[in-house]
Each structure stands twice: as structure tokens, then as C-alpha cells.
Amino acid sequence: MHRLIARVALFSSVGCALPALANEADGTVPRDIDSAFDGDYLILGAGVGYAPDYNGSDDYTLRPIGGFRASISDMRIFSSGVGIGADFIPDAKGARVKFALGPVVRYRANRTGKVRDEVVRLLPRLKATWEVGVTGGVSLEDIFHSRDSVSVRAEVRWTVAGNQGARIISTDVSYFTPLSRAAGIGASLGVDYINRDCADYHYSVSAQGAAASGLPTYQAHGGWKNSTARLYGGYDLDGNLRNGGWGIGGVVSFERLLGSAAQTPMTALRGSRDQWFVGFGLGYTF
């Protein structure tokens, strides 16, 4: 089951979304639907995303996106945002409850390049940051019917380059269900919490920045950064998720900025606390 979810989630994480497909006439999904993923596998995906120019911007840009997921000797390695994560806990065959735990590394490039907003672009550019931490979770399968699942995940990351001392805590709960031999959809709700160092780096406006841009000075504080709702789905192009091959899918995400992320003049005066992301793409399973 985790392998089926992995394929649809990977398709969606690189932007592969389609409208939710209707159930097949018989409404059933075979128990062996993930048989193509017994043993080792590799999923690669690439696509295009439509995302805010910076965190809090109301200007949007198209950008390339990509992702991967692999299973090697019961160890899973996967893309995590712009980064990589791993799960070192093997899944017991046939178990309804499954656990995940491993390291995660992420790259964050907020306001590091050219900014479209003519005022925010006058602020000093930020350096890209590297975040290192731990990710873990638990999932329960066969909730409402055979093959669906509910998962709870938590992640803690610390910045080790670009802005030392920052800490980010992310949690989410998700639900996934296959719709047929070829399609599956999922949804998730999540929140992020940041400490003062992280908030200050990304959302404060210094006296120097205020003089250059005309924005008021602002001192950011730690706390809740955002709440996020996400809908994703994937579809196998030959109509059978069991045999690998090509698939398409995508994701629609709505993020509501909170605390300093919403109150900073970069958001409150020049942007929007409502952040959308839409992505579409293509993936291949080996």
C-alpha cells in the first residue's frame, strides 16, 4: 500500500494533478494493486508549478519542479520540498500500522533572486539556507475500505547554513484513497511553527531596509507561520498502477500565512497572506 501511495504522492509532489476521477463502475480496487512495487523501485517526475514569487507575495511565477522516490533494501529515499529525506524503518508485510523515521535535508531560497515587486526588491537580498533535521510519522491502513490510509507526520529542521539558529517544526495529517486500478487521490492539512531566528531572518524589516524601500521597520517574532490545505491526485497512463510506467497527476495547495509571516510589511502592505500553489507534471516508475 505504501508503494501505491508513494507513486501518487510523487506524481503530485512534482505537480501532476488532475481533477478527481470518478470511481469505476464496480467501485472495487484489487488487493494486489501495488504488486509492481514489491522489492526495489524508482519513481522520477518532472513538471511545472505556479507559485508565489516569495513567501507572502501576491505575484506568481511559473517554475520547473521535480521529484523522486526510491526503495532500496527496505530503505526509502525521497524528495522533500527542495531537498531529500529518508525512512529507515522497514514495513512489516501485511501490517495495518506502519512507522517512518529518518533524516531530512532541505534547501530554502526565499527572496534570494530577483523579486518582481518594485518595493520589496529594494530590500537586501537574503542568502539561501540549508536545513537539516528529522522526519517521522505513522500511518494506519484500511480505514473506511480496503486500501485507503490515514497518516500523521512531524518534521523538525534546523538551519545549518545561511541563517544559523533557525528552527522549523512542520506537522500534517493526510488521507489517501485509490479510486480504481489507475487512479488515486489524497488530501492533507498541516501547520508550520518557526522560532524567532527564522522569523527575524525572513520577515523583519531593518532600519536599513526601511530606508531603502520606504516600508516601515518591523521586528518579527517566532510562532505559527502558516496553515496549509492540499489536494493531490495521480493517474497511470496505461490504466494500471500495478505495472509501473508513465503517470500524470498534480497538486493544488492553499496556504494561509500566520503571525509574523502575515504581519510583515512585505506581506501585509505589498503581498497577500493567502498563498496558492498549483502544479502539473509527468512521472515514470522503474
What does each model-identified segment do?
Residues 44-52, 76-86, 117-121, 149-160:
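Transmembrane beta-strand segments that form the barrel wall of outer-membrane beta-barrel proteins
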Residues 52-54, 87-89, 118-123, 156-160, ...:
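Extracellular loop and loop/strand-boundary signature of outer-membrane beta-barrel proteins
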Residues 40, 60-66, 97, 126-132, ...:
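Residues that define the transmembrane beta-barrel architecture of outer-membrane proteins
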Residues 1-38:
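Cleavable N-terminal export/targeting peptides
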Residues 44-49, 69, 111-117, 148-155, ...:
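Flexible, solvent-exposed coil segments and beta strand-coil junctions
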Residues 46-50, 66-72, 84-90, 103, ...:
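Residues on the lipid-exposed face of transmembrane beta-strands in outer-membrane beta-barrel proteins
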Residues 160-247, 254-262, 267, 284-286:
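Outer-membrane beta-barrel transmembrane domain signature
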Residues 23-40, 56, 75-99, 141-150, ...:
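Short loop/turn motifs that connect adjacent beta-strands in outer-membrane beta-barrel proteins
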